[in-house]
Curated annotation (Swiss-Prot):
Keyword S-adenosyl-L-methionine (UniProt): no
Name this protein carries in UniProt: Probable cytosolic iron-sulfur protein assembly protein Ciao1
Function statement: Essential component of the cytosolic iron-sulfur (Fe/S) protein assembly machinery. Required for the maturation of extramitochondrial Fe/S proteins.
Keyword entries, A-Z: Repeat, WD repeat
SMART domains: WD40
Gene name for this UniProt entry: Ciao1
Gene Ontology BP, a term: iron-sulfur cluster assembly
Pfam families from the UniProt entry: WD40
Length: 335
């Protein structure tokens, strides 16, 4: 049986903490929250401490942050309807660009693997794709209006320029750029959840996606490409995503975030019942009918809702979480 061991409890933000994001090198992370501030934390010896506080970029709650793949830039999505781009080019972090266009709160932000594209989504039901046009220059490449409700999350595929979004309309959408006319189109709609989808994440090679929802379930989706050996039909030669596994009964309230570890294959969930749960694929799992078991759980990981969980991209088994209770926790998962 696995274990979830608490290594550090960190405080500093005022009010609820919405998001945490590991730097690609794994020795630094950023956090954001209700206090309109971003904190950059780093590890010295065995102690995590705040090195920088960025408090002049947003007028309202900061909902999510993400580092660029190169680690030079940090993007922050805010309820003030803007996305800020921060960099350390001058030695100190500063806001070098503010992306405007959304009509309401920006809920999520994500960099493509190449670092050349940025996606944002909002309560205004739209997903925007921005091209990095040069030093601190961003151009809107597409405005996608496929969802019928508030869009909660955007995540890029780990190897291809394919974007996934999750919404209050209970669906996940996939987008890709048409090679002929260079227009971004919705290429797939994933339906199975019965309530708001809060979080999505790809596995290491991007052939599977995990989602979590207000309906208290976690679902695993698999990509079936044209000519697949399973015989799954692919109309218009488009990849089809099918729900191949549903995990239910483990969570008692809405699941707000899910993270699929690229190093170990473990899945972590952040739940409104204050718990963190870790799932592992079973040894007899089949490609078209995968099975997962709960490896371990901490039912009272935080004193209030857990808003985000993120696996360290470098240190296998290290997990970070944040909560409405105003704390950040760093955990070690053993199998």
């Amino acid at each position: 049986m696995g274990r979830l061991i608490l290594e550090h409890t960190l405080q500093g933000h005022k009010g609820r903490i919405w998001g945490v994001a590991w730097h690609p090198k794994g020795n630094v992370f950023a956090s954001c929250g209700e206090d309109k501030a971003i904190r950059i934390w780093s590890l010295t010896g065995n102690t995590w401490s705040t090195k920088t506080i960025l408090s002049d970029g947003h007028k309202r709650t900061i909902r999510e942050i993400q580092w660029s793949p190169c680690g030079q830039y940090l993007a922050s999505a805010s309820f003030d309807a803007t996305t800020a781009i921060w960099s350390k080019s001058s030695g100190e972090f500063e806001c070098n660009a503010t992306l405007e266009g959304h009509e309401n709160e920006v809920k999520s932000v994500s960099w493509s693997r190449s670092g050349g594209l940025l996606a944002t989504c909002s309560r205004d039901k739209s997903v925007w794709i921005w091209e990095v046009a040069g030093d601190d220059e961003f151009e809107c490449a597409a405005v996608l209006n496929s969802h019928t409700q508030d869009v909660k999350r955007v995540v890029w595929h780990p190897t291809k320029e394919i974007l996934a979004s999750a919404s209050y309309d209970n669906t996940i959408k996939m987008y890709a750029e048409e090679p002929i006319d260079n227009d971004w189109d919705c290429t797939a709609t994933l339906t199975s959840h019965t309530s708001t989808i809060w979080g999505i994440d790809f596995d290491a090679d991007g052939e599977r996606l995990v989602s979590c929802s207000d309906d208290t379930t976690v679902k695993i989706w698999r990509a079936y490409h044209p000519g697949n050996s399973a015989g799954v039909a692919t109309p218009d030669q488009q990849t089809v995503w099918k729900c191949v596994c549903t995990l239910s009964g483990q969570h008692s309230r809405a699941i707000y975030d899910v993270s699929w570890c690229k190093l170990t294959g473990l899945i972590a969930t952040a739940c409104g019942d204050d718990g963190i749960r870790i799932f592992k694929e079973t040894s007899d799992s089949k490609p078209d009918e995968p099975t997962f078991e709960q490896l371990t759980a901490e039912e009272s990981a935080h004193d209030q809702d857990v808003n985000s969980v993120q696996w360290n991209p470098v240190v296998a088994g290290q997990l970070i979480s944040c909560s409405d209770d105003g704390t950040i926790k760093i955990w070690k998962v053993t199998e």
